[in-house]
């Protein structure tokens, strides 16, 4: 279950993960988005998630990216140049025809409160995996989502080890920062119209 980040008592989406050979055996009473795992032809829409798939050794299971101009990960850029990963347009202006031809088994998208922007993608009949990790209030909570993404590719063990490494490094850096004499401010993400996002 993915909770709605804007209405904490509501679900944004429920996913029912099943192996391809068991998909037909699931009772119809189970309500939620059915996703056959492991994913083999996914579409990613953020550089952060592309990088995570690289760390999980799953880039061969990426069929396309949205927002290509923001993705600067050498292995993925190389696969795009080789034609192994397609550029399917922008997140809010995807090339629907290209997505139909690609036949993805899932679309990884960031949810937004005004979700009407994905209405055409709903018509594809492809599961949309809402990546609400960016809404987490702490860095470690956001990083822990890598374990969720690991479920979709049957690499939970590797995802768990990656999270443990990130957690260890984060705690070490936090302890070091608390001991520093000067307090610096750090801005991440990007500046848009005078506001950092």
Ranges and model annotations:
Residues 4-100, 106-113:
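A short, structured surface patch at a secondary-structure boundary
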Residues 84, 95-97, 105-196:
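Extracytoplasmic substrate-binding proteins
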């Amino acid at each position: 279950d993915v909770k709605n980040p804007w209405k904490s008592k509501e679900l944004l989406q429920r996913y029912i993960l099943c192996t391809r050979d068991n998909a037909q055996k699931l009772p119809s009473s189970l309500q939620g988005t059915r996703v056959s795992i492991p994913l083999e032809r996914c579409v990613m829409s953020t550089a952060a998630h592309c990088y995570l798939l690289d760390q999980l050794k799953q880039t061969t299971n990426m069929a396309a990216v949205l927002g290509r101009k923001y993705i600067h990960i050498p292995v993925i850029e190389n696969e795009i140049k080789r034609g192994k990963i397609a550029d399917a347009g922008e997140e809010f202006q995807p090339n629907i025809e290209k997505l139909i031809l690609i036949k993805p088994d899932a679309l990884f998208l960031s949810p937004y409160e005004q979700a009407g922007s994905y209405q055409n993608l709903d018509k594809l009949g492809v599961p949309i995996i809402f990546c609400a990790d960016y809404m987490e209030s702490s860095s470690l909570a956001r990083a822990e989502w890598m374990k969720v993404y690991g479920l979709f590719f049957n690499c939970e063990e590797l995802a768990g080890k990656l999270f443990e490494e990130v957690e260890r490094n984060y705690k070490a850096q936090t302890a070091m920062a608390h001991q520093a004499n000067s307090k610096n401010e750090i801005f991440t993400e990007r500046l848009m119209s005078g506001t950092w996002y």
